[in-house]
A protein has these predicted regions:
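N-terminal signal peptide c-region/cleavage motif recognized by signal peptidases
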Residues: 11-17
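Extracellular carbohydrate-recognition regions
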Residues: 17-43, 126-133
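Extracellular beta-strand elements of beta-rich domains used
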Residues: 24, 213, 231-235
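Short carbohydrate-recognition loop motifs
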Residues: 48-71
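Extracellular/lumenal carbohydrate-interaction signature centered on repeated Trp-anchored short motifs
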Residues: 75-86, 179-182, 206
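Extracellular/luminal beta-rich ligand-recognition
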Residues: 108-110, 118-166
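Extracellular beta-strand ligand-recognition surfaces/modules
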Residues: 111-113, 168-178, 182-223, 227
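Exposed low-complexity, polar/acidic, P/S/T/G-rich flexible segments that act as propeptides
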Residues: 113-115, 228-236
Length: 236
């Protein structure tokens, strides 16, 4: 994902009304604002392709990643301190050959749903705190200090929790893994407080405010070509 976590974590800004997330729906080809595309700084890679489509009598976001990188981000301003549950449906149609989340060379995902938190930098271990400060300086972005990314990854056992290969400030939760049949819809519901404490419980005893939610895919490291769908994404 080469520096991809910088773009992935860089979210803060637009006002959000009730419901907390604008739906992945609508008559257009892309979700309505405040959903917006976020790429790498000065990205030269192909962009991940997003499109609203009708599939199985429902509206869904189609995500295609031909050796690409890209995210759709929904910022919450001010960050929301009350939300505790995230739910959605998703379907992996085409997996990424060569993806391996535990290695930088394979740090790709055919589909990911991520939550970014306004976690206090003072709670980080000293070395990670200094790394994040440097990353913020170099990127020019107020990068959050914690993020959870839920992925569908046939290379990992379902239930795995892994640090990102580039930074421990991002943790992967593999919800659908090896043995999960592709081409079928799966429904997810996550207790964000429980997941955050599982990932970062040594730094905090409560869930920080949520600054953004994103949906994305990348295949820039593995050189693959993934295809997936996400629908009915709700934060409450």
């Amino acid at each position: 994902m080469k520096r991809g976590w910088l773009a992935l974590l860089a979210a803060a800004g637009s006002a959000a009304a009730q419901p907390l997330l604008a739906p992945l729906d609508g008559p257009g080809s892309l979700p309505p604002p405040p959903w917006r595309e976020v790429l790498l700084p000065k990205q030269t890679l192909p962009r991940t392709r997003f499109a609203l489509v009708d599939i199985d009598a429902a509206r869904a976001l189609r995500i295609e990643s031909p050796r690409s990188y890209g995210n759709l981000v929904h910022e919450l301003a001010p960050p929301d301190a009350a939300a505790r549950q995230l739910s959605w449906r998703w379907r992996l149609e085409r997996a990424l050959d060569g993806a391996a989340l535990q290695r930088k060379a394979g740090d790709d995902a055919a589909v990911k749903v991520c939550v970014l938190f306004e976690h206090a930098i003072a709670r980080l271990p000293f070395f990670e705190r200094q790394q994040l400060r440097l990353a913020r300086l170099l990127s020019g972005e107020p990068l959050p200090a914690a993020a959870l990314c839920y992925v569908w990854d046939p290379q990992q056992p379902a239930g795995s929790v892994l640090p990102n290969a580039y930074t421990r400030r991002l943790r992967w939760f593999v919800l659908q893994g090896s043995g999960s049949p592709i081409g079928h819809w799966r429904s997810e519901q996550r207790d964000l407080r429980a997941d955050f404490l599982r990932a970062f419980g040594d730094e905090a005893s409560e869930l920080p405010p949520i600054s953004a939610v994103l949906v994305g895919a990348d295949a820039d490291n593995s050189g693959g070509d993934g295809l997936a769908y996400v629908a009915e994404l709700e934060l409450r």
